[in-house]
């Protein structure tokens, strides 16, 4: 949402606007400040925020006339549905739909604090978009794929979040998920858009050529720019590397067959 308020105040009063999710991540999230002028005035925050409630901190002497918000979302309609005889699962599906909706912006992203897409997250959300949204929703996945390959480094490394500004570190396992069966190839399964596959295939092939096998014919671990495979303890990195590499090769093989390479 973009929060809105209408007040009557003297000049120079500072109003703070944030949501209850402002401290919800590892870093503080977005907020807004408004400095009043004399008289009756209204203000709508320029940047969208996400949370369960909007918190306005109003200085003494400011008369609040009205508060509100404008909901913003990606231009898509929800065509998929799920209904069963267990209300728990019906509610769970609606919550999942709402979460997906909140993550669909000009990129697939966490609306609390991110303004670019982590592609490991995009793999998960894109699978939901194919089930729940109309064709406009699928266009967001196409854009995400194009963003990923457009930001490929000269040495073949793929990384996210993209579009990038202050980050260029590869998370290898996430990139395998991105280019593989449940990432880029899943887009083709649900759209039949072979033109996009033809466009991105060379980038996927170039990236996977960076991965090598050891003397046991298991994939060699790549540390990338951020050596992170999963949350928690006792992470079986070797299993994860080989499982995601296998799925990535399956996606690449499907692309090659489609394109006759």
Language-model segment annotations:
Residues 1-110, 121, 136-142, 159-166, ...:
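Extracellular/oxidizing-compartment recognition motifs
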Residues 14-16, 79, 122-150, 198-209:
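Carboxylate/His-rich catalytic cores and anion/metal-binding grooves
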Residues 23, 126-184:
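Structured core of small recognition/catalytic domains
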Residues 28-32, 38, 105-111, 155-179, ...:
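The feature captures the catalytic groove of carbohydrate-active enzymes
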Residues 42-45, 83-87, 113-116, 132-139, ...:
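Alpha-helix capping and helix-loop boundary segments enriched in small/acidic/polar residues
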Residues 52-55, 97, 126, 145, ...:
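Short, well-ordered alpha-helical packing segments
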Residues 93, 97-108, 139-159, 200-219:
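Long, well-ordered core segments of solenoidal/helical folds
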Residues 124-135, 179-196, 244-261:
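Well-ordered alpha-helical scaffold segments within catalytic/enzyme domains
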């Amino acid at each position: 949402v973009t929060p809105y308020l209408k007040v009557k105040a003297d000049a120079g009063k500072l109003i703070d606007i944030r949501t209850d999710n402002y401290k919800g991540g590892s870093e503080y999230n977005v907020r807004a400040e408004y400095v009043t002028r004399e008289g009756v005035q209204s203000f709508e925050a320029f940047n969208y925020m996400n949370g369960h409630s909007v918190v306005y901190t109003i200085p003494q002497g400011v008369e609040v006339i009205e508060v509100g918000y404008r909901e913003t979302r990606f231009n898509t309609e929800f065509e998929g549905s799920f209904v069963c005889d267990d209300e728990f699962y019906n509610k769970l599906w609606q919550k999942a739909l709402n979460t997906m909706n909140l993550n669909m912006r000009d990129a697939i992203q966490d609306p609390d604090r991110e303004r670019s897409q982590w592609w490991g997250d995009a793999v998960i959300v894109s699978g939901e978009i194919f089930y729940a949204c109309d064709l406009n929703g699928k266009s967001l996945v196409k854009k995400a794929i194009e963003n990923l390959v457009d930001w490929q480094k000269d040495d073949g490394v793929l990384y996210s979040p993209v579009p990038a500004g202050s980050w260029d570190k590869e998370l290898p396992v996430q990139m395998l998920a991105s280019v593989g069966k449940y990432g880029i190839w899943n887009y083709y399964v649900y759209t039949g858009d072979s033109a996009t596959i033809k466009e991105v295939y060379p980038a996927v092939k170039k990236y996977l050529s960076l991965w090598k096998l050891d003397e046991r014919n298991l994939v060699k671990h790549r540390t990338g720019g951020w050596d992170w495979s999963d949350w928690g303890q006792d992470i079986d990195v070797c299993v994860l590397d080989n499982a995601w590499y296998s799925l990535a090769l399956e996606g690449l093989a499907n692309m090659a067959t489609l394109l006759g390479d």
